[in-house]
Amino acid sequence: TPIKSSAASDVYKRQGLDIFKALGSDVRIEIIKLLIENKEMNMNELAAKLNITNGALTGHIKKLEACGIVNTSNDSSGHGNQKICTLHLDKILIDLDAPEEAQNVYNAELQVGHYCNYEVYPTCGLATASHLIGEVDDTRYFAHPDRYNADILWFSKGFVEYEIPNFIPGSQKITQILISAELSSEAPGINNVWPSDISFYLNDVCIGTWTSPGDFGDVRGIFTPDWWFPNWNQYGLLKMLVINKKGTFIDGLQISDVTIRDFNLDYRSSMKLRMAVNDNAEHVGGLTIFGKSFGNYGQDIKVSINYAPIEE
């Protein structure tokens, strides 16, 4: 669905202003640092660490919560009713460049199990929100009919490939593709320090590689279901892959000079996105892809396609 830029732009400006205001305080920066180090803390613990009163802390927490940086919840498991604070955002990306063709965007989501091609090697497996699909470390189950419902998959090397839906209007060319997905490495068990070189391909052309730092299991993922094993991958990092006329970027950092113009894509084009851990990579550390029922972000693989009229 096309997004009209004027109203959306005003909303984004207001959101950005609130975030900058929230970060304009040494105390609030210290709160963020403490929550990064400790994952979660109650109000009493934070106030003691910061040497301020609970009343003063409440005002700071409200500002951080209002712009989505911090979440609060009530925990009545201990003595009394404690308010627990956790960090909601792990990154803030500031894009000072005006969005290109922002009024013409097609958005879609791909479930983790909707791959159209794969070649994977153990350790590997996949699961829906409620159960494992078949047995782990048996690649045959990547062809099981239930795999379309998969919300998480993992493998030590190989690839999965997705067909990107292209339903932009006729007589339009593609000017940018943005992919957003929660990813991590795949270690035997869990290991927060387990680098893996994950390469991204568009229509069989490598557009760049990102090194995942680890396979994270120190705390349970926010959306990871209760039945999931505690010593298995719990959450990943939300990565934003963008290819446009300037190159290919991960989280705003350029990873290659491959541009969208190299593909000459329009409303008739088919597009395939491959995520791979290659045999010849420096770090062959596997790949885990998290869907909306696992990890920390509650989303599937999101795709945004910017388009503009084809010039005659």
Describe each region flagged by the PLM.
Residues 21-25, 42, 75-97:
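Short, cationic-aromatic polyanion-contact patches
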Residues 90-154, 158:
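Amphipathic alpha-helical dimerization/coiled-coil segments
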Residues 1-8, 12:
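Single conserved hydrophobic/aromatic residue that forms the stacking wall/gate
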Residues 48, 65-66:
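Alpha-helical residues within the helix-turn-helix
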Residues 173-192:
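A short beta-strand element within beta-rich, extracytoplasmic domains
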Residues 151-172, 255-259:
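Short beta-strands within extracellular/lumenal beta-sheet-rich domains
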